[in-house]
Amino acid sequence: MTTVQEIIEYVETLTGHGINRDEGLQHGEGSRTVRGATVAWMASPDAIRAAGEAGHDLLIGHESLYFPYDVVNAVEPPADWRAWPVNRQRYELLERYGLAFARLHGSVDEICIFDTFAGLLGLGDPVYVDGLVKVYAIAPRPVRQLVDEVKASTGMPHLRVAPAGALDQIVRRVGLPWGGLGLFVNVGYQQRLIAQGCDVFIAGESDSYGFRFAAECGIPMIETSHEVSENPGLRHFTTMLSQAFPDVAFRFYENPCIFEIVL
């Protein structure tokens, strides 16, 4: 029978290195036998309930289990973080359903999340690769057209766009600050793409600082959302796990984009 730890070790064989500091078992026992497992972008209450009601033993989450971000590894976390209602609810639900929780973050980005997002957008092979810094060449087109193409690819009816000028600006080299790489805390990633001649970004999640960083470099940014940019890769990862561990019933739970645009 497959254990939680064996699933984690399998991920390490795919990346060729140990899991990252923010990854690993964060609730339950690593020696636990897994007969059913749910994979989700985040261990939201609905995701935990879905795993529990399916009778699963394990919930694999891509994002931080608790707030503030990665608090379980924080050097000086807020003294009362466990009592925060959002954290207490998640903990109590995991306990109620008897679930183990493992976080698999950057490892799955490496394995398939980034490339699946690029494939969803129809970008083909990158023209520059340095780890997860990748640049894609496209036929020259106006930003407005690229926005419409991203809408069609993602199924999102509306997108936030920081155009950095006119929407008729012609672009030809795409960078992908997927997930949270478009946020202000990750502008260093944007700069690495800029250094390779990117002239447009298709991002997961961004914010005003992140948008402004790109705009002041003359680079328009098209935002999808953190979830939308990573869910397809996590669905693919679920299939990979199913093939690697046929004795375990894996299921993907889709965390929807949390916000709505009200016109």
PLM regions: where:
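Active-site catalytic microenvironments in core metabolic enzymes, especially phosphate/sugar-handling
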Residues: 1-263
